[in-house]
């Protein structure tokens, strides 16, 4: 696996919830409330100031995730935090299940076809709802459905390689 001590962006502060210092969060975890399981948080303000926070509590209010940061007691403090990004160390995440991957672990891997044709490297992934899509950048950008075993034949972190069944001309 790649550098497991790198930071993973899990969410951001989107605004205040009420007047007593509660914080509305946007989370990119699945499920979204899982963001509270992974701590400590490394928060980076829009100006680049980083702070480590432990003991964050939160809940899913239906429309938003709502959190309490230690020491944050009023709406003005929260509003000044708008746009703050929430990170954790990669090592804070549990190991993925067999044949499951964290997207961040796939980024940067080389991609080759089953015939050995190099297509480029994994740039990023996104979800369509039906399946995830891996974006490969090389001589051009390709979007390949991350569907195993139909299109993605293997992922080998030791070899830094994803093998796909894909027409290099497509």
Swiss-Prot record:
Binds ribosomal protein uS19. The gene is rimM. An accessory protein needed during the final step in the assembly of 30S ribosomal subunit, possibly for assembly of the head region. Essential for efficient processing of 16S rRNA. May be needed both before and after RbfA during the maturation of 16S rRNA. It has affinity for free ribosomal 30S subunits but not for 70S ribosomes. The keyword Phosphoprotein does not apply. Belongs to the RimM family. The PRC barrel domain binds ribosomal protein uS19. Residues 97-170 form the PRC barrel domain. It is found in: Cytoplasm. The keyword Cytoplasm applies. It comes from the Bacteria. This is Ribosome maturation factor RimM. It comes from Stenotrophomonas maltophilia (strain K279a). Pfam families: PRC_RimM, RimM. The lineage of its organism: Bacteria, Pseudomonadati, Pseudomonadota, Gammaproteobacteria, Lysobacterales. Keywords: Chaperone, Cytoplasm, Ribosome biogenesis, rRNA processing. GO terms for molecular function: ribosome binding. One of its GO terms (cellular component) is cytoplasm. Signal peptide: none annotated. PANTHER family: RIBOSOME MATURATION FACTOR RIMM. GO terms for biological process: ribosomal small subunit biogenesis; rRNA processing.
């Amino acid at each position: 696996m790649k550098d497991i001590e790198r930071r993973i962006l899990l969410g951001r502060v989107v605004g205040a919830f009420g007047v007593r210092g509660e914080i509305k969060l946007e989370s990119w975890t699945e499920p979204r409330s899982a963001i509270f399981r992974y701590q400590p948080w490394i928060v980076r303000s829009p100006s680049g100031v980083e702070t480590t926070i432990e003991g964050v509590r939160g809940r899913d209010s239906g429309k938003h995730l709502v959190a309490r940061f230690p020491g944050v007691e009023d709406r003005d403090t929260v509003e000044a935090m708008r746009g703050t990004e929430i990170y954790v160390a990669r090592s804070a995440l549990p190991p993925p299940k067999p044949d499951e991957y964290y997207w961040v672990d796939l980024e940067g891997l080389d991609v080759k076809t089953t015939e050995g044709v190099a297509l480029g490297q994994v740039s990023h992934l996104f979800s369509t709802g039906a399946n995830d899509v891996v974006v490969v950048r090389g001589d051009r950008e390709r979007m390949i459905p991350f569907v195993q075993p139909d299109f993605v034949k293997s992922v080998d972190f030791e070899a830094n390689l994803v093998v796909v069944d894909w027409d290099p001309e497509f």
